[in-house]
Swiss-Prot record:
Alpha(8)-beta(8). The alpha component is a flavoprotein, the beta component is a hemoprotein. InterPro entries: CysI (IPR011786), NiRdtase/SiRdtase_haem-b_fer (IPR005117), Nit/Sulf_reduc_fer-like_dom_sf (IPR036136), NO2/SO3_Rdtase_4Fe4S_dom (IPR006067), NO2/SO3_Rdtase_4Fe4S_prot (IPR045169), NO2/SO3_Rdtase_4Fe4S_sf (IPR045854), NO2/SO3_Rdtase_FeS/sirohaem_BS (IPR006066). It comes from Shigella flexneri. One of its GO terms (molecular function) is sulfite reductase (ferredoxin) activity. This is Sulfite reductase [NADPH] hemoprotein beta-component. The lineage of its organism: Bacteria, Pseudomonadati, Pseudomonadota, Gammaproteobacteria, Enterobacterales.
Amino acid sequence: MSEKHPGPLVVEGKLTDAERMKLESNYLRGTIAEDLNDGLTGGFKGDNFLLIRFHGMYQQDDRDIRAERAEQKLEPRHAMLLRCRLPGGVITTKQWQAIDKFAGENTIYGSIRLTNRQTFQFHGILKKNVKPVHQMLHSVGLDALATANDMNRNVLCTSNPYESQLHAEAYEWAKKISEHLLPRTRAYAEIWLDQEKVATTDEEPILGQTYLPRKFKTTVVIPPQNDIDLHANDMNFVAIAENGKLVGFNLLVGGGLSIEHGNKKTYARTASEFGYLPLEHTLAVAEAVVTTQRDWGNRTDRKNAKTKYTLERVGVETFKAEVERRAGIKFEPIRPYEFTGRGDRIGWVKGIDDNWHLTLFIENGRILDYPGRPLKTGLLEIAKIHKGDFRITANQNLIIAGVPESEKAKIEKIAKESGLMNAVTPQRENSMACVSFPTCPLAMAEAERFLPSFIDNIDNLMVKHGVSDEHIVMRVTGCPNGCGRAMLAEVGLVGKAPGRYNLHLGGNRIGTRIPRMYKENITEPEILASLDELIGRWAKEREAGEGFGDFTVRAGIIRPVLDPARDLWD
């Protein structure tokens, strides 16, 4: 819908059942506490199945054994995924030791999964361990509040270990924004931390009694790195610095990648520039964006409820004017900024504070002791001696941050002995997948388990065509919800069915263009045959410094997506 013909500010109609659930939940309590004591099932029932998401958990089951258990007349092997709230991805070594211990002793899979939302997840928490995991997190100053469902999720912040002063300032703002937009209900503390019920009535001055219409994602990004993939997020604060000091932010609103196969009312969308704001208005503006989306977002259709759809319905200028009105400011013109990349700098980087930072490539973010590569044990050993902190990146990697020169050799020795510094190709460093099977209930095709061998094949093609020192930003997501951020990749695979994917081309290296579907519902051999031909052409015909995605557009292989709300599906 164009600016000239804006739609209604509020969508009238029958509200979704999720709205009923939130309203009746008594500020997210439901009957979760009672359900915890029901030993007849390993899962949560009724509304509680969805309400636990507000407490940072998803109920899942092992899909590899689902059919087998059904044959045995057993319920699915229910277990929870828990996602920690960790603004900016910074975690202390004491906290790391606690989560390592819990993962090893109290989860089915024994792993820590770093995510591209800059936090960690536990998979396979049985119901009896759900309360203990929240209490363990609390004991080391962490929580899982608002990391899922209709709230402001974990706030991302560029992992920039080199410019330590600027990163420190941006990180503080990521924490402040996260805290400011948290729900105020005491449900989390009452249910998981056994804090006593207080007679006062809960109030949610920012989120409201029915919270947001849909999930909401926020970033703080420090150019020229776009490692956090700004355009995948609802609200983005782009850091503007003068003489290395943060002075304000450019605000971009309305990005998001989730689509539904065949539903042309859904689309991925890049965020729209609203303007520049000085630092002192940051929290007021963040609150204004969230409350405008709270009041104007579509509560009659969850597939059309995110901020990107609200912007398209009411018009960018209308939404922006409402944010200005609520925040009591006028945006200044956007200040100049540019992105040059979004990958992590793997290996040692010296910061301007003379400390060293070691970025470790963790394939798919999965930390486990593999045969000959005890990654989990290695990181635990480093955590025991390292005086700085760890930082999870939005590329699912891990930074050992703030290493003094005197400790460098000791940490490198452990990292090398544990397989944490094994050499990988540039292509593998720039490839990513979501979890998908066996734990994700939405998975349509493999992603995390598919990626390593798929990249082996891509590496072979890169060698064949003489471009093995290059990379293509390549991502696999197991379903169109898009957790793997394939809809901002140069080559994006979106799961369609077991062993089949939609192949998207035409994104760019810096993550500012949505790719278009090139081929639908194809197998791995068909994908590789297409990419063999196209990588060969790119190797021969590209211009100096031209990335694969830009080449596919310039060469006319794929039409660029210019206005996704209108031309993504053309």
